[in-house]
């Protein structure tokens, strides 16, 4: 737990130096903190995050995505494709492992109601991209956001994050269900 606290402290210091986006979401059992750094004029986004579930364990990730507009019309459709390096520590299963899931995200903002957006992401690592005790990893997120301030959104979402392990232990659902969150852009 000291490692996680140190990681959060370092992340908060980095936010003040390089900040682009800080995302926080939670429900009664889980908390997720994510930082996104947008590399200027390259279309690359670098991100790091931590998901903690009070009973099921932790997920740490670092990722890279190529991001651009996927639409040519008035309505804005932003897409990002890439991957992540993921470390999982399942408290209930006693297992941990690494995975390299590939995937991406879509974010749709209709011009007529441009304060509202719908977003989703999907990441999957089959056994060939799993290392150690991990057999596969999957994460799906959907959310509806409202742009409260120019640089701040509030959202309601649903998330499913699961790690499957090679040994005879139950698969770990790190989070499943609804959450609320906010996204701050600097």
Specify the residue positions occupied by each region the protein language model found:
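Short glycine/proline- and aromatic-enriched beta-strand/turn motifs that initiate or cap beta-hairpins
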Residues: 16-68
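Outer-membrane beta-barrel "beta-signal"
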Residues: 146, 173-186
